[in-house]
Design a protein with these regions (language model features):
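C-terminal substrate-recognition "lid" of short-chain dehydrogenase/reductases
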Residues: 47-50, 142-171, 176
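Short, well-ordered secondary-structure patches that form non-catalytic structural/interaction elements
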Residues: 30-36, 40, 190
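Alpha-helical segment proximal to the catalytic Tyr-Lys
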Residues: 55, 98-102, 162
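Short, small/polar-rich loop/turn modules that mediate ligand/substrate recognition or access, typified
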Residues: 16, 101, 106, 164-166
Length: 193
């Protein structure tokens, strides 16, 4: 946020940070640059956005929403780089919820599950067979839609969530309860063939 922007529009009430980099690869087949690229995009990108905007957040009353991933808390084969980066994003969320809470700033994360018609699904579930397997592994029996994530963000930004901070909120149809592993297995079979 530039000083001129905030001077014109006023303090930031809601900040959503959603940088994501991803590609399937086993750790032994990944370069240090590949690993670093995902860390730079996901974790360092979130750090830079949050650090550079803190001075421009409305205090008290603003909210920060980071977009995480199931790989932050659920190990997934072929995703060591994303697991490490998004776990860092979730811990950064919790730490800043404590630090910035004193200023009246709330910080939470949303963890999207499989969301239809997104770049992430196209990259991680590139075939109909994998898409079907992922959908079948979601307890609610469907992939989410972008509006599911938007609704969660709107809730976290609303006055109804004014006493919620430091929360890592899965919006995944129950996928994080066990279905995540199926994608790792599918990725392994695709990259080995």
């Amino acid at each position: 946020c530039s000083h001129d922007f905030c001077e014109h529009f006023g303090p930031i009430d809601v900040l959503v940070s959603g940088a994501a980099g991803n590609f399937p690869a086993p750790l032994t087949g990944m370069s240090a640059n590949g690993f670093k690229a995902v860390m730079d995009i996901d974790l360092l990108g979130t750090f830079h956005v949050m650090r550079s905007t803190h001075a421009f957040l409305a205090k008290p009353g603003s909210t920060v929403i980071n977009i995480s991933a199931p790989q932050a808390f659920q190990p997934m084969e072929m995703q060591a780089h994303v697991c490490a980066a998004k776990a860092g994003v979730d811990m950064l969320t919790r730490v800043l919820a404590m630090e910035w809470g004193r200023d009246g700033v709330r910080v939470n994360s949303i963890v999207p599950g499989p969301i239809a018609d997104t770049e992430g699904m196209a990259r991680l579930a590139p075939t109909r067979e994998i898409q079907r397997a992922v959908t079948e592994s979601v307890p609610l029996g469907r992939q989410g839609v972008k509006e599911d994530i938007a609704a969660a963000a709107m809730f976290l930004a609303s006055p109804e969530a004014s006493y919620i901070t430091g929360v890592i909120l899965p919006v995944d149809g129950g996928w994080s309860l066990g279905g995540v592993a199926s994608l790792g297995n599918a990725l392994k079979s695709v990259t080995s063939s």
